[in-house]
Amino acid sequence: MRILVTNDDGIHAPGLKVLEEIARELSDDVWVVAPETDQSGVSHSLSLNDPLRLRRVAETRFAVKGTPSDCVIMGVRHILKERGPDLVLSGVNRGQNVAEDVTYSGTVAGAMEGTILGVRSIALSQAYGVGGRANVKWHTAAEHGARTIRRILEAGIEPGILVNVNFPDCEPEAVEGIAVVAQGMRNQQLLAIDERLDGRGNPYFWLAFAKARFEPGHGTDLKAIAENRIAVTPLRLDLTDEPTLTRFAQVFG
C-alpha cells in the first residue's frame, strides 16, 4: 500500500513526524508532501495566483510552498503521477479538529483533496487541553493511530467520503475506545474579538474564545473527546442538504 502523508502545520511539525511513524506501521511505501510553512486555518484553499515551489527534503520527503490542498495535488498529480497513492493521511494536527473546526482546517482539507482525487483519505488530530500547545500528548496519537486507521480501512471508505479522526487529550492507557460520532457544534457566543493596542497606540485584534461552561451534544465529536474516546467522524464532499432540497423543490417547483 502506497501512502501519501501531508499536514497543515508544516514540514517540520512534530505531528507530521508522528504521522510518518504511524504510516510506516502500515506500509513501507510512505511519501511525505507537506507545506514549507505553517498553513493552519487555510481550509481548502488553492494557490491559484502564486507558483508552487517544490523542495526535495529527502528521498521520499518533499516540501511545497503552498497549502495542504496544493501538497496533495502535487503528490498525486506530479510526484507520484506514475503510480498514485492508495491512501492519503493528513496530520497529525496540533489540536483538535472537531465541530465547525472542520470548515477552517487545513488538515481536514488535505484529506478532502485526496478524496476529490479519488484516494481514500483520513485526517488525524491530537487534542490538547489546559497545558496548551507546548504539552500536546503526541504519544496518544502514536499509540492508537495505526490501529484506528486499520479499523477504518477494514470498515471501508466509500467514494466521496473522508474520515476525520480526533485523539483525546489523555494518556494512551486512559483512552476509552473509539466512538463513531457526528460533527458537533459549539456555542458561537463564545467567539469574541480581543482588541489590543500596539506600541504606537494603534488597535489590532485577535480572535479569541471566551471561557465558559459548555455542554457538548450527545453523539458528537466534541462529546467523544471530552469522554476520552477517539472520535471517528465520516464526512462527505457533497454538501447538499437533502431535506431543504426537497422542500425548496416543492416551493419553487
Swiss-Prot record:
Keywords: Cytoplasm, Hydrolase, Metal-binding, Nucleotide-binding. It catalyses: a ribonucleoside 5'-phosphate + H2O = a ribonucleoside + phosphate. Pfam families: SurE (PF01975). The keyword Oxidoreductase does not apply. One of its GO terms (molecular function) is metal ion binding. The keyword Cell membrane does not apply. InterPro entries: SurE, SurE-like_Pase/nucleotidase, SurE-like_sf. It is an enzyme of class 3 (hydrolase). It comes from the Bacteria. Binds 1 divalent metal cation per subunit. Its cofactor is a divalent metal cation. Its main location: cytoplasm. Its EC number is 3.1.3.5. PANTHER family: 5'-NUCLEOTIDASE SURE (PTHR30457), 5'_3'-NUCLEOTIDASE SURE (PTHR30457:SF12). Nucleotidase that shows phosphatase activity on nucleoside 5'-monophosphates. NCBIfam families: PRK00346.1-4, surE. Belongs to the SurE nucleotidase family. This is 5'-nucleotidase SurE. It comes from Methylobacterium nodulans (strain LMG 21967 / CNCM I-2342 / ORS 2060). The gene is surE.
